[in-house]
């Protein structure tokens, strides 16, 4: 591989100047604030919700994603501060990013069941759409870890975004999933729990589906609404259970025993895709930076926007 020849940039930065020290100090304070917000997003719905999730034998959303990724592989989180300064929790009730699974770069979008039972709203929908756009533009597989109560349709008093504000866009969201398939970009979904209404369309529009036994519940509506509309008395397993979808509807290609088994199967599916991202590979070796990246903290003034 040919090395690109160029003259190294000579820095004139004075690391001992007062201006540099002031800028660096201000930047470190802002980074600390950013990390606190990211920690808040990671906490999701709080310890009580995480305890209830663990009591049902389920993994937190971030553990699901990191078990899916190759060990020690790079991961770039997407929209970690979604819904910041809104009426919804930071992170938008979802965890997303670009990572590597079975050696294949992919985009992962995962509902956080500890936040509003994974219900989707204006901010989480925007995050979801951004993930699909990246998958489409970069031609890399799109992975969904689904556990969602569907759309949050509740009216919220004083909310900047009404409960129905995102609902009109739902058709576009599902269209984008099918567009990925049309472009031969693989879509893989693991259903870890309830996927109601709009949440049911996530696996419904995907190429490969893995449902966790006795947990996945994929249906447009639950038994009470079915009884109200048709008079039929049914169970959740009858309407949307994993076993039913594997044996009758055909929506589920794979049945998993638990969360970890579902993730294992998803990694196997990835390994069988035989997928290569289109585009040019690096054409030359890249040398490490001459100067420390920490020096960047003292260059930019904190008031610069």
Go through each PLM region and give its residues.
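Amphipathic alpha-helical segments at domain termini/boundaries
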Residues: 1-79, 220-305
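Residue-level detector of solvent-exposed, low-hydrophobicity positions
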Residues: 16, 27, 66, 75, ...
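Long, structured ligand/cofactor-binding scaffold of large enzymes
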Residues: 51-188
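Conserved catalytic cores of soluble enzyme domains
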Residues: 146-278
């Amino acid at each position: 591989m040919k090395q690109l020849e160029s003259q190294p940039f000579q820095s004139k930065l004075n690391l001992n100047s007062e201006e540099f020290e002031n800028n660096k100090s201000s930047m470190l304070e802002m980074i600390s604030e950013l990390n606190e917000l990211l920690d808040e997003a990671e906490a999701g719905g709080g310890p009580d919700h995480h305890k209830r999730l663990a009591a049902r034998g389920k993994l937190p959303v971030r553990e699901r994603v990191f078990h899916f990724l190759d060990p020690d592989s790079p991961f770039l989180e997407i929209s970690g501060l979604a819904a910041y300064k809104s009426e919804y929790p930071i992170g938008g009730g979802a965890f997303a990013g670009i990572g590597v699974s079975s050696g294949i770069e992919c985009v992962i979008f995962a509902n956080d069941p500890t936040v509003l039972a994974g219900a989707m709203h204006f901010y989480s929908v925007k995050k979801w759409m951004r993930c699909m756009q990246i998958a489409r533009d970069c031609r890399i597989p799109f992975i969904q870890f689904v556990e969602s109560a569907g759309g949050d349709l509740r009216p919220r008093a004083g909310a900047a975004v009404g409960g129905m504000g995102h609902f009109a866009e739902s058709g576009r969201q599902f269209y984008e999933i099918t567009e990925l398939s049309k472009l031969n970009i693989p879509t893989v979904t693991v259903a870890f729990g309830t996927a109601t209404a709009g949440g049911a369309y996530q696996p419904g529009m995907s190429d490969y589906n893995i449902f966790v036994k006795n947990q996945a519940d994929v249906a447009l509506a639950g038994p009470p609404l079915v009884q109200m509309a048709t008079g039929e008395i049914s169970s959740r397993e009858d309407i949307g259970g994993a076993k039913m979808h594997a044996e009758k509807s055909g929506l589920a290609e794979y049945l998993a025993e638990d969360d970890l088994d579902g993730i294992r199967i998803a990694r196997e599916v990835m390994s069988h895709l035989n997928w290569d991202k289109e585009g040019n590979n690096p054409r030359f070796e890249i040398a490490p930076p001459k100067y420390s990246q920490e020096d960047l903290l003292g260059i930019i003034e904190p008031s610069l926007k």
